[in-house]
Amino acid sequence: MANQRIRIRLKSFDHRLIDQSAQEIVDTAKRTGAQVCGPVPLPTRIERFNVLTSPHVNKDARDQYEIRTHKRMVDIVQPTDKTVDALMKLDLAAGVDVQIALG
């Protein structure tokens, strides 16, 4: 796997969970002899919602909710075959979305 790069993007609603998963990926890649860049924190996406509390009147009474989507990126430079096998066997938390791109 000469001159290749694996880019792993992680998404989660819980920042502790995503940091733990990113650290597991970095530890696994370093243990198998690959160079690692990251984890790089990407901008957090914040979605805000305003909901009327009253079904009829009182337009001023509202509840505010938000969803934060945290993102991290890990680049693995010059991965070995052992690195790819170890990453495939890695069991991450259920609340983390993983996207892998080869470049």
UniProtKB/Swiss-Prot annotation:
The protein's name in its UniProt record: Small ribosomal subunit protein uS10
Matches recorded under Pfam families: Ribosomal_S10
Described purpose of this protein according to its UniProt entry: Involved in the binding of tRNA to the ribosomes.
Listed InterPro entries: Ribosomal_uS10, Ribosomal_uS10_CS, Ribosomal_uS10_dom, Ribosomal_uS10_dom_sf
Species, as recorded: Psychrobacter arcticus (strain DSM 17307 / VKM B-2377 / 273-4)
Transmembrane listed as a keyword: no
One of the GO BP terms on file: translation
Family: Belongs to the universal ribosomal protein uS10 family.
GO cellular component terms listed in the entry, alphabetical order: ribonucleoprotein complex; ribosome
Stretches assigned to coiled coil: none
NCBIfam families: PRK00596.1, rpsJ_bact
